[in-house]
Swiss-Prot record:
Single GO MF annotation: L-arginine transmembrane transporter activity
Family according to the record: Belongs to the LysE/ArgO transporter (TC 2.A.75) family.
Organism: Salmonella typhimurium (strain LT2 / SGSC1412 / ATCC 700720)
GO cellular component: plasma membrane
GO biological process annotation, one example: amino acid transport
Key words of the record: Amino-acid transport, Cell inner membrane, Cell membrane, Membrane, Transmembrane, Transmembrane helix, Transport
Entry superkingdom: Bacteria
Protein name in the entry: Arginine exporter protein ArgO
PANTHER family the record matches: ARGININE EXPORTER PROTEIN ARGO, ARGININE EXPORTER PROTEIN ARGO-RELATED
Keyword RNA-binding part of the UniProt annotation: no
Amino acid sequence: MISYYFQGFALGAAMILPLGPQNAFVMNQGIRRQYHLMIALLCALSDLVLISAGIFGGSALLMQSPWLLALVTWGGVAFLLWYGFGALKTAMSSNLELASAEVMKQGRWKIIATMLAVTWLNPHVYLDTFVVLGSLGGQLAMEPKRWFALGTISASFLWFFGLALLAAWLAPRLRTAKAQRIINILVGVVMWLIAFQLAREGVAHMHALFN
């Protein structure tokens, strides 16, 4: 059964490594050393719920609810555009230290709300966990399925905590004004690129719904 664990771990790692909104947010919180371990835990727990739902039967709900997928897609587009605008606005601020200080004043609950939006309003998360993992893990017998899910979840926990701790460790080098400007520009551009990609997918999806 251990082979199914490593299959799940490898697939989970392959899907989570690319830089996306969730990884960018965890990295940013790590650099700020602001609730970064709590955010890593909440991201990993969110993945646990999504992965379990996808592998153990939740994929059918998404596949049978095209309007739900469309709603999540356009909600994600709006959020990513807003979040990217905030990052670019901070990067372009004439007083970057003051702008960064304002961001640091964000309370715990606002940070948690942002993390939940970054995770649950990203339709790619549902495609990864419900469609990809659901189709591969869902066809296994119950015992191999559990090991496969455990491997995928382990990859998520290891990645998010590793990313948060690494970013916090590198924080002294990455909290300079120049580094912060580059990071905020990178985060803003990534958020907008993903938003435009989602918008294209959303338009195609809506076109398919009405035809």
